[in-house]
Amino acid sequence: MHQKSIEEAKKRLFSGELVIFPTETVYGIGGNANNHKSIELIYKTKNRPINNPLICHFANIREIEKNFVLKDKDYELANTFWPGPLTLILEKNKQSLISPLLSNNKNHVGCRIPNNEISLSLLSILDFPIAAPSANIATRTSATSIKNLDYKLKEIFYIDGGSSVLGLESTVIQTTNNGCKILRLGSLTIEDIKMKFPKYEINIEQSNVSPGNQLKHYSPIKPIRINVDFIKKNETLLNFGVNKLTSNIKNLNLSIKGNLSDASYNFYNYLNILDNTNCSGIAVAPIPDQGLGKTINDRLKRASYKDDK
């Protein structure tokens, strides 16, 4: 069904152009990870700071092994959660062809194998990985469908794969001797990891080798208030579960049943809808701070960040 689009994307990537493609998490805007000019074009197109690294997408673990060193715990996580929303921070080997520009000249790079038929089909016919951040303008909300793309990005060739099935970015992890460090919360939860590896020591940390750690990030254009217990007159409402909160303009509920997987799936789409509503701002109901709720709250905290300087 998408074969012609995949072949066209291949041609464009080989010529140094960018393409927008679906993954199970969010849509990515990608280029040849070995091509310096393609990497520069990604940063320029997104208006993305060069100190915010990119993630490399691969078809299989053999391709990753050609460029990176994997330790025992890297293999444990990879064999359990790939393909899927896991990004592993790995050290480049001496044979690596990966452009240093995508990691701001650091020797560690985020790598993942997406769990999406279209992206895997595309990656399997390339002889290079795809470097791809989320398909948005820097600091803005991620896109989980083509209709969510910023108008500035719709001129770029894209493959329409429908809505992303998970709706939140991948979890960025760096392994340690005793477990792992989570450098960016994502669709793979701490509980998911603990269920498979109960003896792992898991810590949440920040690092400049991981994307997504800017104070202001994942943000709609309209101002946003989180953990609200009342709605202002001209605000829309992003609700969760059953409560008495209501907006006189527009109400969207991430999950009336209080299901965090449903909330994740709807999150960016609903934020985009409310952001395009005639209102003064977006009020967001409290989200349980567990499982995927912890990831949603991380995104909301960054989305609502105000620089008071």
Regions found by a protein language model. Give the residues of each.
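Active-site-adjacent structural elements in enzyme catalytic cores
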Residues: 1-309
